[in-house]
UniProtKB/Swiss-Prot annotation:
PANTHER family for the chain: FERROCHELATASE, FERROCHELATASE, MITOCHONDRIAL
GO cellular component, one term: cytoplasm
Record field: catalytic activity: heme b + 2 H(+) = protoporphyrin IX + Fe(2+)
Catalytic EC class: lyase
Entry function: Catalyzes the ferrous insertion into protoporphyrin IX.
Cellular location(s): Cytoplasm
This protein's encoding gene: hemH
Binding sites annotated in the UniProt record for Fe cation: 196, 277
Keywords: Cytoplasm, Heme biosynthesis, Iron, Lyase, Metal-binding, Porphyrin biosynthesis
The protein, known as: Ferrochelatase
Amino acid sequence: MAEVGVLLLNLGGPDKQEDVRPFLYNLFADPEIIRIPVPPLQKPLAWLISTLRAPKSRKNYQAIGGGSPLRAITNQQGRVLKKALAARGLDIEVYVGMRYWHPFTEEAVRKIKADGIRRLVLLPLYPQYSISTSGSSFKLLDQIWARDPSLKAIERITINSWYSRPGYIRAMGERVREGLDKFDNPDGVHILFSAHGVPRTYVDQDGDPYQRQTEETVDLVMQSLGRPNAHSLAYQSRVGPVEWLKPYTEDTINELAQKGVRSLLAVPVSFISEHIETLQEIEIEYREVAEAAGIHDFRRAKALNVNKTFIDDLAEMVIENLGVYSR
């Protein structure tokens, strides 16, 4: 049995319709997602929000098959990453820990402990760091370690972000190129990078580096792409009445249409796997927005999923952070 492990950290998603409301409750009960000035109100408010949002969310998940594919894709990424590490001569176990649904991070840590892992790489499947994504998972892991003194025997090696890694940037460029080449006139297509938004206060007040890292990602991808296409960056998936990072994706689509754009490639920039935000929000909702605005050639670049360039780069990242040699 390997004594070295990798823990892939991700959001999680409901596997079936019955999971939607409890998944939403777990999401909104996290103070890094919804900040409530009175902490005792966090869970009651999470119950209310999840109950009110569940019917619409179920409908959205129904439109993509009834549930989220994120668990299956992340498990597949774990298997392919393990093979990529083995191909480099390394016996490393790969685990999956989701923040808001099964397999929960707590479940993964129990398995890691039972397997006798001594060195553990924490690899968030979020290229850009945010308080609300990687930060929330790291905080949870700190709490788990604090509750169980025996876990202190496990050395934790944390990867905070990896948005500028050449392999990741190349893989993103491959996906954009694949998407562009499906158009009749690839050079005339406007590329719209759509990233998950965060509340504006996270950046302005708390110093969250997410916006800066996302903007740098887009710049690096466009440099790697080497195409003449015009491009924009916008933010999606906002929740609640507070201001989130702007511009919002739907507003940007309408503005581009007003400027005469008729061919648009939407590129999910902070999502490395297909899930509700790519398959439903971009693929269905934003397509409808685009067509209503007069953009009739709207397409979406695929998420990275198990793209070989991407998985190979994850393997190299693990090796570099462990400080070991591979063949």
